[in-house]
Every structure is written in C-alpha cells, then in structure tokens.
Amino acid sequence: MNSHFASAHTPFYINTKEGRYLVLKAVKVCDVRTVEFEGSKASCVLKVDKPSSPASERRPSSPSRCERMNNPGKQVPFMRTDMLQNMFAANRDNVASRLLS
C-alpha cells in the first residue's frame, strides 16, 4: 500500500448541520496541505441530496408471515439422489468391460 494512503477506522458517524451521517468506507489521506477558507467566500460546495421521504417510508415492509403457494394435490418433483452414483457405476462397468475384452 502506498505510504500516503491508509484506511480510516470505519464505520463512523459525522455530525453536520443537516444531521448525522454514517460513513461506511473512508480513506485517510496523509501529507496533503489544508487550505483555509471562509464559508461565505467558498467556491466549492458539497451538495447533499436529502431523501424525499423519511427512511421508515422507504424501507420495504417485512412480510408478516411466510407465504407459500400450497397445492395439496400437487407434489414437488425431486431429483433422483442416486443419479450421480449410477453414473459412476455405469462408467466403471464400461471401463471394466473394455479392459476385459
């Protein structure tokens, strides 16, 4: 890893005027100069788009119970469990018959 970059301890919170933000991944940059500025004269502004609805409204609702499509007369087809074993046995028998003939 480059000596100028290091992973910051994540996750962590940042408190701002707009609210509290959870930072999941961050990179700590070393040896970079800091430029002092006044907020009223700043030419670069970080824009944060606020969500249009509260988080509780955006979250999908959890199902209250497990829903199944049960058809009592219809059984679920299962794959034969001995298929792989039969395939190896047939291969073994074919090889043995070729060797003996």
From Swiss-Prot:
Phosphorylated on two serines. While these phosphorylations do not play a role in virion assembly; they are essential for the interaction with host RICTOR and RPTOR. It comes from the Viruses. One of its GO terms (biological process) is symbiont-mediated suppression of host innate immune response. InterPro entries: Phosphoprotein_F17 (IPR006854). Self-associates to form high molecular-weight forms. Interacts with protein OPG157. Interacts with host RICTOR and RPTOR; these interactions disrupt the mTORC1 and mTORC2 crosstalk. Plays an essential role in virion assembly and morphogenesis. Also plays a role in the inhibition of host immune response by dysregulating mTOR. Sequesters host RICTOR and RPTOR, thereby disrupting mTORC1 and mTORC2 crosstalk. In turn, blocks the host antiviral response in part through mTOR-dependent degradation of cGAS, the primary poxvirus sensor. This is Phosphoprotein OPG062. It comes from Variola virus (isolate Human/India/Ind3/1967) (VARV). The lineage of its organism: Viruses, Varidnaviria, Bamfordvirae, Nucleocytoviricota, Pokkesviricetes.
